[in-house]
Amino acid sequence: MNSSFSHLDGQGNVTMVDVGGKQATERVAIAEAVVELRPATLELLLKVALPKGDVLTCAKIGGIMAAKRVGEIIPLCHPLSLTYADIRFEVSEAPPRIRIEAETRTVGNTGVEMEAIVAAQTAAAVIYDMCKAVQRDIIISRVRLLHKRGGKSGEFNAPDMEE
């Protein structure tokens, strides 16, 4: 079977990619997620007045923790030694939303895109969890890879991120 999917062998069976022969290079990935809230919920979040406490600090910690565990929760992902992981927030009051940007880095022979994506998703889920007592219809959207650099495939920028 001829497949362009890297996690399938010649017979179409699922397999973990052998990255042992790949060159170790600096790998960087940035992903985003957007959390849409009602104005009153965002106001409580920013005032640190929600019942569960400081939402953004917990979301940052949760996202970083998730980035470090991707090899355990995403099938066929290699466990990586991250050299850097960070979560940044861009808060908008109109429309009321929080844009999450997750950045991950390593020096290794496989990329860190999944680590960045899972970190952004998890930070968004933490925000949902900590705000759900006051709002159940929170929307998590626009989870995507914005940028990756390093390795054989080179650099990628999401189409609307091109300069």
Swiss-Prot record:
InterPro entries named in the record: MoaC, MoaC_bact/euk, MoaC_sf, MoCo_biosynth_MoaA/MoaC, Mopterin_CF_biosynth-C_dom
Listed pathway(s): Cofactor biosynthesis; molybdopterin biosynthesis
Gene3D superfamilies referenced in this protein's UniProt entry, alphabetically: Molybdopterin cofactor biosynthesis C (MoaC) domain
Residues that bind substrate: L76, C77, H78, M114, E115
Record EC number: 4.6.1.17
Molecular function in Gene Ontology: cyclic pyranopterin monophosphate synthase activity
A family per Pfam: MoaC
Reaction(s) the record says it catalyses: (8S)-3',8-cyclo-7,8-dihydroguanosine 5'-triphosphate = cyclic pyranopterin phosphate + diphosphate
Active site per UniProt: D129
Assembly: Homohexamer; trimer of dimers.
Function comment: Catalyzes the conversion of (8S)-3',8-cyclo-7,8-dihydroguanosine 5'-triphosphate to cyclic pyranopterin monophosphate (cPMP).
Protein name: Cyclic pyranopterin monophosphate synthase
Organism name: Desulfovibrio desulfuricans (strain ATCC 27774 / DSM 6949 / MB)
Lineage of the species this protein comes from: Bacteria, Pseudomonadati, Thermodesulfobacteriota, Desulfovibrionia, Desulfovibrionales
Gene this chain is encoded by: moaC
